[in-house]
Curated annotation (Swiss-Prot):
This is Large ribosomal subunit protein bL9. The gene is rplI. It comes from Campylobacter curvus (strain 525.92). GO terms for cellular component: ribonucleoprotein complex; ribosome. GO terms for biological process: translation. Belongs to the bacterial ribosomal protein bL9 family.
Length: 149
């Protein structure tokens, strides 16, 4: 019997492969545990259509992330913080503040977990480069200008 693997099976193959197996193994184990489906022409056609749809969605998502990367790379985000008597900042600029300012000033929503700041970063007035990990191995460099008020 021919089966279409839905999930990776250690001794048999990877998801998406069509394999010839014994009837009992195919029906009782693979199909029974949801690891495979009987490889009928309809099942194969549906699987290929679903794979094509996933690829198109992935391309669309990556193109949107590339656009966001380009937008973020052009922005210099200005964040004003209160200065102490000696001219240093009270505290530091946090990921949350960067994400909130991006949304407020530029209407761009970025998850605060995607923003990477070093421990000793953004604790003084100045211009900084901050990495924003967008997903699918795409990251952008955002310029953050910390100013005192």
């Amino acid at each position: 019997m021919k089966v279409l693997l839905i999930k990776d099976v250690k001794s048999l193959g990877k998801a998406g492969e069509i394999k010839e197996v014994k009837d009992g193994y195919g029906n009782n184990f693979l199909i029974g545990k949801g690891l495979a489906k009987a490889a009928t022409p309809d099942v194969i056609r549906q699987y290929e259509a679903a794979q094509k749809r996933k690829e198109e969605e992935l391309k669309y998502e990556i193109s949107n992330l590339e656009k966001l990367k380009d937008e973020l790379s052009k922005i210099t985000l200005v964040i004003k913080k209160t200065l102490g008597a000696n001219g240093s900042l009270f505290g530091s600029v946090s990921k949350e503040e960067i994400a909130e300012e991006l949304e407020k000033a530029h209407h761009l929503i970025v998850d605060k977990k995607a923003i990477e700041i070093d421990k000793n970063h953004l604790k003084a007035v100045g211009l900084y480069d901050v990495q924003v990990k967008l997903g699918h191995a795409i990251s952008a460099t955002l310029k953050v200008d910390v100013q005192g008020e």
